[in-house]
Curated annotation (Swiss-Prot):
GO annotations of cellular component type: cytoplasm; plasma membrane
Residues that, per the record, bind substrate: 71, 116-120, 178, 183, 243-244
Name of the gene encoding the protein in the UniProt record: pyrD
The protein's name: Dihydroorotate dehydrogenase (quinone)
Cofactors (names): FMN
Species the sequence originates in: Helicobacter pylori (strain Shi470)
């Protein structure tokens, strides 16, 4: 009831203005362990059936918040308190950048979807690392999503990713290379076998922490599988599928710029993930993101082969109860099918 009133006010504002107001509150809450404890007591949810050990990291539950919400690593404590099993911060770039011109964030309310053309706006890796350390340690794994600065030419992209990773080596529990945002010109062109191989070979030499590749939902299936295979062969530990889509046919009134996320992406993301899991289940840790907004969809992705999940748009539309609702219902679905834990259900449809 409270969030429905707050949502009505927030949705009367420009989408980015509303996000900034929420972030300001979350930053304030993150500075207070007491307030974070109150949030956790109201909206957190813990159940041993949902716990899992993946790549040496303990996940209290499989539901994470996707990159893009906490771009500067300034509100992780508060977000964890809302029940997430892990968070992915960023996207961070080597140098600070302002991103694309506003307006650059839009709602498609009927489709419960968002369209963003943000362009990796962030304060840069150095300031983000300081912010991370200010509030560390954290109660869940934290991923760091890494991107390329807009001004960097493609020929120097590998050096730029090396530079941003180098500045983040002492923060986070895993790293995700973002080559799939549609909002940095030509970034998606880096989703090719040769570059991905170079990128992960380089990163593997720099860190022993888990490395992930985040892919676009708009690749042809064969191209996607080739890129993913190249990443895994070069040392990637996991694949996150998918980023936002540039398929404007999925909403009634799309804006010209930006990628779409939310319920409009559910079917497309699920289909991509199904093909990914068929080829790489048990060969890599698979993370499903895109249009997940309830326990039923979350459970389907897990049975399809997802060890972990991520949400974003659904959190905007459904508010602070979302994690708790999904996780409680997920436990019921596991019990109904006779699974003793979420770990047992991973990839059940492939067995």
């Amino acid at each position: 009831m409270l969030y429905s009133l707050l949502k009505k006010y927030l949705f009367s504002l420009d989408a980015e203005d509303a996000h900034e107001k929420v972030c300001k509150i979350l930053r304030m809450l993150s500075s207070s362990p007491f307030l974070c404890g109150l949030i956790d007591s109201q909206w957190g949810y813990k159940n041993p059936k949902l716990e899992n050990e993946i790549l040496g990291l303990h996940f209290p539950n499989p539901l994470g918040l996707a990159a893009g919400f906490d771009k500067n690593i300034s509100m992780l404590r508060a977000l964890i308190a809302f029940g997430f099993g892990y968070l992915e911060a960023g996207t961070l770039t080597n140098e600070a950048q302002v991103g694309n011109e506003r307006p650059r964030l839009f709602r498609h309310i009927e489709e419960e979807s968002l369209q963003n053309a943000m362009g990796f706006n962030n304060h840069g890796a150095i300031l983000a690392a300081r912010s991370f350390n200010r509030f560390a340690p954290y109660k869940t794994p934290i991923g760091i999503n890494l991107g390329k600065n807009k001004r960097i030419e493609q020929v120097h992209a590998l050096e730029d990713y090396k530079a941003v990773l180098n500045k983040c080596l002492n923060i986070g529990d895993y790293y995700t290379f973002n080559l799939s945002s549609p909002n940095t010109p030509n970034l998606r062109d880096l989703q090719n076998k040769a570059f991905v191989n170079e990128l992960f070979c380089m990163a593997k030499e720099m860190t022993h922490k888990p490395l992930f590749l985040k892919i676009a939902p708009d690749l042809e299936i064969d191209d996607m599988l080739e890129v993913v295979n190249s990443a895994i062969e070069a040392g990637a530990h996991g694949i996150i599928a998918t980023n936002t889509t540039i398929d404007k046919s999925l909403v009634f009134a799309p804006k010209e710029m930006g990628g779409l996320s939310g319920k409009c992406l559910t079917k497309k993301s699920r289909e991509i993930f199904k093909e990914l899991a068929k080829a790489f289940f048990n060969k890599s840790v698979l993370v499903s993101v895109g249009g997940i907004s309830d326990a039923k969809e979350a459970y389907e992705r897990i049975k399809m082969g997802a060890s972990l999940l991520q949400i974003y748009s659904a959190f905007i539309y459904n508010g602070p109860n979302l994690c708790q609702n999904i996780l409680k219902d997920l436990v019921k679905l596991l019990q109904k099918d006779g699974f003793l834990s979420v770990k047992e259900a991973i990839g059940a449809d492939l067995r």
